[in-house]
């Protein structure tokens, strides 16, 4: 099980778990567990197998092994850098109640001239409110006691990676669903959509439209697109647009049919983001839709949050419901009473909301 051992030995991204119910020798016990799993002492195969089998029946090993799995999931989860993190604002909430985000605009409009002995005009302000709530997501899996015994824990070697991928995919789906063809965010009244395929001309229109957005007092908000998000089907088109030095456009009938000119879009510093979930979430325009986003540090179109203290996927193990005939406790690795299966569960708490429509723009051929 080299994959499992590699993850065990990779302590990058390690975050100490809660110290509740951990003895003062906990870290030493955890190290001994890792040494046993990885055979750090280079024991002969038959002795290593014997010690593993013995460990499965002890009371400490199941919990320590579960902690190892938990840390592996964290390492695998943090090793992935989802593309959506570039164009959304990230935060935390303290509970499952609806959290409110307020955006105050105004108060910074131009100063009005004040006549001699005249009154100063009041500074007008406007307030926008957004509701953000997180939800709980998860799955459980079970492994038969026989499999654990026969496979020397090899059956669990890719479990951390699978759980980490599941968490990453869940977050990605949620984020993409927030903006993909969002009929509330993208409207003609908002001036942030166009029913045109991705071209240099349509991208110029999008950039100009975002730059022209104003606040409630018709003051410019100095808005500028930083990211262009496309599905895999448009990646090559987007790259060609962003790297081409020249473009060709048609002139009037009296002049030449077409002539080259500079492609200024390539000079705008847009960052290309390819979202593979766009065609999955948006079955209508997912292959042809394209999006622009401002820098979320300036103006956020989307905000996502984890539950505070639970910013990563978490694994827990089901305690055994069996006891010995004499009434003694049996460790979780012995499985449940009915089937002898050993149960694990992964949990993720996550949520998001769309915020300022002026921080994004949508284009597509079938809008």
Q: For each predicted feature, which ranges?
A:
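Short, solvent-exposed loop/turn segments at the edges of secondary structure
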Residues: 134-138, 223, 339
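Assembly/oligomerization interface modules of large self-assembling protein complexes
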Residues: 57-137
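Alpha-helical scaffold segments that mediate packing/assembly in large oligomeric complexes
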Residues: 139, 143-158, 162-217
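Short alpha-helical segments and helix-capping/turn motifs at coil-helix boundaries
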Residues: 71, 126, 213, 328-330
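Sequence/fold signature of self-assembling virion shell proteins
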Residues: 191, 197, 205-209, 226, ...
């Amino acid at each position: 099980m080299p994959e499992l051992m590699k993850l065990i030995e990779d302590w990058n991204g390690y975050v100490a778990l809660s110290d509740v119910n951990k003895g003062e020798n906990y870290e030493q016990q955890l190290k001994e567990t890792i040494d046993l799993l990885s055979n750090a002492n280079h024991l002969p195969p038959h002795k290593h197998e014997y010690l593993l089998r013995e460990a499965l029946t002890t009371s400490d090993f199941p919990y320590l092994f579960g902690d190892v799995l938990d840390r592996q999931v964290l390492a695998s989860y943090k090793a992935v850098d989802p593309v959506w993190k570039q164009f959304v604002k990230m935060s935390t909430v303290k509970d499952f109640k609806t959290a409110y985000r307020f955006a105050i605009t105004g108060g910074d409009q131009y100063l009005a001239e004040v006549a001699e002995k005249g009154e100063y005009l009041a500074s007008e302000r406007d307030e926008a409110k957004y509701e953000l709530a997180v939800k709980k997501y998860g799955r459980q899996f079970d492994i038969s006691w026989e499999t654990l015994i026969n496979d020397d824990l090899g059956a669990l070697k890719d479990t951390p990676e699978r759980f980490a991928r599941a968490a990453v995919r869940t977050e990605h789906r949620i984020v993409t669903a927030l903006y993909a063809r969002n009929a509330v965010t993208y409207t003609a009244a908002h001036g942030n959509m166009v029913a045109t395929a991705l071209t240099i001309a349509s991208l110029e229109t999008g950039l100009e439209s975002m730059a022209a957005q104003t606040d409630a007092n018709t003051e410019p908000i100095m808005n500028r697109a930083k990211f262009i998000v496309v599905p895999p089907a448009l990646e090559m088109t987007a790259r060609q647009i962003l790297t081409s030095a020249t473009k060709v456009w048609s002139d009037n009938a009296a002049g030449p049919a077409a002539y080259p000119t500079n492609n200024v879009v390539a000079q705008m510093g847009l960052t290309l983001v390819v979202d593979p979930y766009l065609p999955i979430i948006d079955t209508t325009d997912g292959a042809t839709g394209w999006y622009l986003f401002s820098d979320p540090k300036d103006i956020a179109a989307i905000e996502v949050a984890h539950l505070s203290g639970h910013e990563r996927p978490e694994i827990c193990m089901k305690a055994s419901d069996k006891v010995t005939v004499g009434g003694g406790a049996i460790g979780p690795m012995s499985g449940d009473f009915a089937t002898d299966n050993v149960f694990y569960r992964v949990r993720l708490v996550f949520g998001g909301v769309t915020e300022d429509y002026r921080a994004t723009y949508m284009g597509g051929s079938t809008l």
